[in-house]
From Swiss-Prot:
Family membership: Belongs to the PsbB/PsbC family. PsbC subfamily.
Source organism of the structure: Chlamydomonas moewusii
Physiological role: One of the components of the core complex of photosystem II (PSII). It binds chlorophyll and helps catalyze the primary light-induced photochemical processes of PSII. PSII is a light-driven water:plastoquinone oxidoreductase, using light energy to abstract electrons from H(2)O, generating O(2) and a proton gradient subsequently used for ATP formation.
Keyword tRNA processing belongs to the record: no
Positions that bind [CaMn4O5] cluster: E355
Subunit record text: PSII is composed of 1 copy each of membrane proteins PsbA, PsbB, PsbC, PsbD, PsbE, PsbF, PsbH, PsbI, PsbJ, PsbK, PsbL, PsbM, PsbT, PsbX, PsbY, PsbZ, Psb30/Ycf12, at least 3 peripheral proteins of the oxygen-evolving complex and a large number of cofactors. It forms dimeric complexes.
Residue positions assigned to the propeptide: 1-2
Residues annotated with Phosphothreonine modification: T3
Protein name: Photosystem II CP43 reaction center protein
Localisation per UniProt entry: Plastid, Chloroplast thylakoid membrane
Membrane protein topology class: Multi-pass membrane protein
Regions crossing the membrane: 57-81, 122-143, 166-188, 243-263, 279-300, 435-459
GO cellular component: chloroplast thylakoid membrane; photosystem II
Length: 461
């Protein structure tokens, strides 16, 4: 009887007996075939870039400029818009052609990568060591592995510097904090102070401290990319021209599966950080494109009702709510004037539509009575009804309507997907790290199934 796990099955000219891996182990069959593994990696990159290009064009073809991006389920166009392409004051889309160009460039790139993947998978040499020693490698060659690490670091550093160059010299990027409701601007004075940039790493991850996710200005973001880009480039050069120190040779497991586990752990970490950034941060992820954060929607609702009732004659400074606390305004634990009601839990929220109304001691009563601008009212009303909540009951006081339009915020998509995928990658990290350590310690690979009870049972069919 043939089963899915039939060890005699041959795929791509390789079977379990000759490689030590069954067909479902995927690229494990190519561990020692550097040429074929190169093909698999290039083809994989082609698939990724193809998705980016195709999805980009899909979003462009469905995009309605009159509606906010976050109301249209878009996740790629907001990223391009954040880079300052095709948008003007207030985040209004004034030109979709750059988005089309981005999609086409990715499609063309994916074709090149796809061709390279097919070539190296089917036509090119199985191993690179003999014909192209510079590109060849042996997994246990510690010096070669750290050199490859160096090349990767240099590429990452160049990527970080591309954002710096775009922000400082090639048109600027979108700043949600620009006066009047956001605009594209050139970052002329990025923060390069070491204590400021790396101080983010020392912050608590809780509440308003928010670790690195609390960054609220583009100067710090671009300055951080200058630091990271420079460190990656110099770190890459260091790893290319040096050999691992004795402690590193002893501490790490040096095998293909170990490197896979390290990579999966790094990607999982980045996934978790991206999850928090896309959910909480409204500077790197401007709310004009991604929709409001949860706290932002809650604060926007409190602000909207304050504006409405103040126009109707309510004394918003002294009105009491049903609990005896301030209905519209109250004091924070530190004495600041904050919005009242359930949104009190988000008292340390900061957003560009709200900050102009603050004074030295929180919200300024005089500004609330005399200085509220129409764009602030419009934006708050829009954000109030587009909270990134998947709940039928109210969260943070945000009114939810079960008969309303089925709105799912891009922040919900991005945060959830990055957390779930980050978790899967973390499990993969643990799995492959355990296997790599076991192999390095000399344990027998796999499980001996000779005495497995199921082997003596009658087939189901």
């Amino acid at each position: 009887m043939e089963t899915l796990f039939n060890g005699t099955l041959t795929v791509g000219g390789r079977d379990q007996e000759t490689t030590g891996f069954a067909w479902w182990a995927g690229n494990a069959r190519l561990i020692n075939l550097s040429g074929k593994l190169l093909g698999a990696h290039v083809a994989h990159a082609g698939l990724i870039v193809f998705w980016a290009g195709a999805m980009n064009l899909f979003e462009v073809s469905h995009f309605v400029p009159e509606k906010p991006m976050y109301e249209q389920g878009l996740i790629l166009l907001p990223h391009i818009a954040s880079l300052g392409y095709g948008v003007g004051p207030g985040g209004e889309v004034i030109d979709t052609f750059p988005y089309f160009v981005s999609g086409v460039l990715h499609l063309i790139s994916s074709a090149v990568l796809g061709f390279g993947g097919v070539y190296h998978s089917l036509i090119g040499p199985e191993t690179l060591e003999e014909s192209f020693p510079f590109f060849g490698y042996i997994w246990k060659d510690k010096n070669k592995m750290t050199s490859i690490l160096g090349y990767h670091l240099i590429m990452l550093g160049c990527g970080a510097w591309l954002l710096v160059l775009k922000a400082m010299y090639f048109g600027g990027i979108y700043d949600t904090w620009a006066p009047g409701g956001g605009d594209v601007r050139i970052i002329t004075n990025p923060t390069t102070n070491f204590a400021t940039i790396f101080g983010y790493l020392l912050r608590s991850p809780f509440g308003g401290d928010g670790w690195i996710c609390s960054v609220d200005n583009l100067e710090d973001i671009i300055g951080g990319h200058i630091w990271i880009g420079t460190l990656c480039i110099f770190g890459g050069i260091w790893h290319i021209y040096t050999t691992p120190w004795p402690w590193a040779r002893r501490a790490f497991v040096w095998s293909g599966e170990a490197y896979l586990s390290y990579s999966l752990g790094a990607i999982a970490t980045m996934g978790f950080i991206a999850c928090c950034f896309s959910w909480f941060n409204n500077t790197a992820y401007p709310s004009e494109f991604y929709g409001p954060t949860g706290p932002e929607a809650s604060q926007a609702q409190a602000f909207t009702f304050l504006v409405r009732d103040q126009r109707l004659g309510a004394n918003v400074a002294s009105a009491q709510g049903p609990t005896g606390l301030g209905k519209y305004l109250m004091r924070s634990p530190t004495g600041e004037i904050i919005f009242g009601g359930e949104t009190m839990r988000f008292w340390d929220f900061r957003g560009p539509w709200c900050e102009p109304l603050r004074g030295p001691n929180g919200l300024d009563l005089n500004k609330l009575k005399n200085d509220i601008q129409p764009w602030q009212e419009r934006r708050a009303a829009e954000y109030m009804t587009h909270a990134p909540l998947g709940s039928l009951n109210s969260v943070g006081g945000v009114a939810t309507e079960i008969n309303a339009v089925n709105f799912v915020s891009p922040r919900s998509w991005l945060a959830t997907s990055h957390f779930v995928l980050g978790f899967f990658f973390f499990v993969g990290h643990l799995w492959h790290a355990g296997r790599a350590r076991a192999a390095a310690a000399g344990f027998e690979k796999g499980i001996d199934r000779v005495d497995e009870p199921v082997l003596s049972m009658r087939p189901l069919d």
